[in-house]
């Protein structure tokens, strides 16, 4: 790691500690040239697969878009933001676990529906009605009947 003070290449780690519930490492470093000390933080970079939309357009995975879609479905429902974040993290780890560089948007939609079904049935129906483009009340009824099985 380069020294931020004198830009020397040689630095040494003098202390390391886990921070943020073990998700990152805080390191105290000292420059071997100017002897200045500084702190760095290390976090694992987890690469998400690209999303292939139904029209074959490819775009980077967008966590904000995922969160926004789930929050719309969960609007005014009794679900905590912690539960939503856990669901999002579950979806992201499932996508990473595929080992693929690209995943179809349909897979993401199905994972969202799976998580919403566990969190709140009303939110699940809201999301499903838009995601599956329900045309009439009969389709709502069929989906509700499937939920009750």
From Swiss-Prot:
The keyword Transcription applies. The keyword Electron transport does not apply. Keywords: ATP-binding, DNA-binding, Metal-binding, Nucleotide-binding, Repressor, Transcription, Transcription regulation, Zinc, Zinc-finger. Pfam families: ATP-cone, Zn_ribbon_NrdR. Its cofactor is Zn(2+). Coiled coil: none annotated. Binds 1 zinc ion. PROSITE patterns: ATP_CONE. One of its GO terms (biological process) is negative regulation of DNA-templated transcription. A zinc finger (unnamed) spans 3-34. GO terms for molecular function: ATP binding; DNA binding; zinc ion binding. Residues 49-139 form the ATP-cone domain. It comes from the Bacteria. NCBIfam families: transcriptional regulator NrdR. Negatively regulates transcription of bacterial ribonucleotide reductase nrd genes and operons by binding to NrdR-boxes. Belongs to the NrdR family. PANTHER family: TRANSCRIPTIONAL REPRESSOR NRDR (PTHR30455:SF2). This is Transcriptional repressor NrdR. The lineage of its organism: Bacteria, Pseudomonadati, Pseudomonadota, Gammaproteobacteria, Enterobacterales.
């Amino acid at each position: 790691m380069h020294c931020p003070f004198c830009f020397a290449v040689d630095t040494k780690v003098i202390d390391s500690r886990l921070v943020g519930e073990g998700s990152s490492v805080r390191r105290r470093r000292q420059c071997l040239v100017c002897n200045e000390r500084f702190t760095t933080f290390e976090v694992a970079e987890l690469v998400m697969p690209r999303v292939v939309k139904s029209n074959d357009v490819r775009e980077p995975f967008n966590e904000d878009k995922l969160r926004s879609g789930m929050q719309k479905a969960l609007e005014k429902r009794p679900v905590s933001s912690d539960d939503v974040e856990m669901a999002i993290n579950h979806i992201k780890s499932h996508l990473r676990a595929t080992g693929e560089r690209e995943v179809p948007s349909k897979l993401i939609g199905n994972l969202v529906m799976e998580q919403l079904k566990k969190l709140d049935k009303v939110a699940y129906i809201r999301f499903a009605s838009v995601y599956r483009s329900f045309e009439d009340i009969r389709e709502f009824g069929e989906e509700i009947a499937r939920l009750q099985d």
